[in-house]
């Protein structure tokens, strides 16, 4: 028969599962940056909300809208055609739905996993999204972390606070700096704070030794397939705040990685790659990793702007290599 055309001529299809595109903030949205990079490389973009992904007789399907993207803060997308496809008709899928990391999120990862079994590259790997909870995954790298206790037992949490004198307490399932408190030994509100954060001893809670360097802010470092982008985004807390989240009003500035930052990345990089975590953001305060964000890391656009990078293009370079491997 006739030789088939080389795969190069076939338009690559990218699925993206995300929050509603009309409500993003374009100039700082990493998912938009990724779609713009994919589009520039000739990919066709298929957009899904979590509600659009479904199992039909065990086949993972999706109701899509195709998108055209624009790097424009007033007009950043247009819908094209609407349709339905098997997820395994796509070449790659970006799972960019923000937490909450709840059962609904987990069900969606099972649907994506079925497409993965049929050869679709999912970024990040669905099983690893389930296994590598943002705050708990740091336990794999104790050499990179400050003293930490995870418990929902108020007595244990209180004992840790007494022992370390100055601590940060946060719910394991929080996002964007919500419900993060600094608690010092002897604080008359300690019991009330433990009760609130642990939802009356029903929710696992993380308490960590306070890292004084937080006054210099925290740093977000991005890794693509385990290799760090050589610049970090330092987030300076709003005056009087303990929280270095952009969502909590922090200001940002880019800076090159320090030697210690690079060491931390070298510790975690191989494990991230082995687990199929192709795009990850780690949060660093002082000398320590405080969180490893695998679900929907951001800060691409800020670093691109500050240093003339194109981080999303690097990501797609990596995705395309993986697909042709």
Model segments located where?
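Conserved N-proximal alpha/beta basic substrate-recognition cap immediately N-terminal to
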Residues: 11, 22-150
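Phosphate-binding site of ATP-dependent enzymes
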Residues: 30-31, 154-155, 162-166, 173-264, ...
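Short glycine-enriched loops at secondary-structure junctions
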Residues: 126-130, 235-237, 285-288
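Short glycine-rich anion-binding loops that position phosphate/pyrophosphate groups of nucleotides
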Residues: 20, 97-100, 172-174, 297
């Amino acid at each position: 028969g006739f030789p088939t055309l080389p795969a190069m001529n076939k338009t690559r299809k990218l699925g993206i599962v995300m929050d509603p595109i009309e409500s993003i903030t374009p100039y700082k949205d990493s998912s938009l940056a990724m779609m713009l990079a994919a589009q520039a490389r000739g990919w066709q973009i298929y957009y899904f909300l979590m509600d659009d992904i479904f199992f039909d007789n065990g086949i993972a399907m999706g109701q899509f809208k195709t998108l055209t993207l624009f790097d424009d803060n007033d007009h950043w997308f247009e819908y094209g055609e609407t349709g339905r496809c098997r997820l395994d008709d796509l070449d790659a899928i970006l799972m960019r739905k923000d937490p909450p990391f709840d059962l609904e999120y987990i069900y969606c990862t099972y649907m994506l996993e079925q497409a993965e079994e049929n050869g679709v590259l999912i970024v990040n790997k669905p099983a690893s999204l389930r296994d590598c909870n943002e705050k708990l995954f740091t336990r794999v790298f104790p050499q990179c972390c400050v003293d930490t206790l995870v418990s929902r037992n108020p007595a244990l949490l209180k004992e840790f606070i007494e022992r370390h004198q100055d601590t940060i307490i946060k719910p394991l399932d929080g996002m964007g700096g919500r419900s993060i408190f600094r608690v010092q030994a002897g604080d008359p509100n300690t019991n009330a704070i433990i009760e609130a954060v642990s939802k009356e001893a029903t929710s696992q809670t993380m308490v960590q030794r306070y890292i004084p360097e937080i006054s210099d802010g925290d740093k977000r470092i991005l890794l693509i397939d385990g290799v760090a982008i050589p610049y970090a985004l330092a987030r300076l807390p709003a005056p009087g705040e303990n929280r270095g989240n952009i969502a909590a009003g922090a200001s940002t500035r880019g800076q090159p990685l320090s030697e210690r930052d690079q060491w931390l990345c070298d510790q975690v990089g191989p494990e991230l790659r082995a687990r199929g975590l192709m795009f990850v953001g780690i949060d660093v305060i002082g000398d320590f990793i405080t969180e490893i964000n695998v679900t929907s890391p951001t800060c691409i656009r800020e670093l691109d702007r500050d240093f003339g990078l194109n981080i999303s293009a690097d990501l797609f370079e990596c995705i395309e290599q993986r697909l042709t491997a």
